[in-house]
Amino acid sequence: MFLDKLGVDKSNWSELFSACVGKATLLQKRAFKLLVEGSNWQVDFDSSKIYFDGREFDMQFIGSESFSSNTWLWGYENINGFDERLLELANKAREFGEKFGLSAFSKPQFELDENFNGHTISMILCTAFDEQNYYRIEYEGGAAYVAFRSDVIFEEPVLANELLSIVNECISSYELDHKIFIKGLLLSCGIKFSESPNEIVSDKYELSFKFDELNRLINILSKL
């Protein structure tokens, strides 16, 4: 688990999200471009499969949002009586939450808000465990979230312009610990870096990220 190498507080939702959101955003963008966009999709919960234009992938059920009660319900509660094979990832989340005191993972049901919802939960879960993608399936009264893994998403190396695009998008969209975010993105992408109190320099692409005393990103230098 790359979180071990990163050294974040696994009981701290903000640190976990900061560490995972970069890679999750990158994977979701790649999946949309390579698989989802313009595709006909189909889900088979009995066989634990998801299909995009006939391409088949193993699937895990994460959980669901209820529009009427505005709540999240974890898949490990298994109110639908799914095969346990479909719930392995959700059960890992529960074990993680119980071990590290992360209530968003260990509490079966809770109210949704901008910080705790299907998207943010799936981003952390799919990046922390196996770097999978997730897909949102909306239905009458709610939405289900499922995870899947496709090797095609990982075939192309992460380019500098792709990396910088993710940095700009995430920092403008979420409240993050910028330093944890940059380190998490680089580490989860397999990009080595060196670190000083106010700067992170990636060995690849000669990128320099500079921070103020509050870990806020104040400058990016690149030779692009």
Regions found by a protein language model. Give the residues of each.
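Beta-strand-connecting loop/turn residues
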Residues: 46-48, 70, 141-142, 196-199, ...
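Short, solvent-exposed secondary-structure boundary motifs
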Residues: 27-35, 113-129, 181-192, 199-202
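Secondary-structure transition/turn motif
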Residues: 51-56, 77-79, 149-152, 201-206, ...
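Alpha-helical oligomerization segments
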Residues: 158-224
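Surface-exposed beta-loop interaction hotspot
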Residues: 79-176
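N-terminal leader/presequence regions that precede the main folded/catalytic core
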Residues: 1-91, 95
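Short, exposed beta-strand/loop patches in secreted or surface proteins that constitute
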Residues: 33-45, 137, 191-195, 199-200, ...
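Short amphipathic beta-strand/extended segments with alternating polar/hydrophobic composition
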Residues: 54-64, 147-148, 207-212
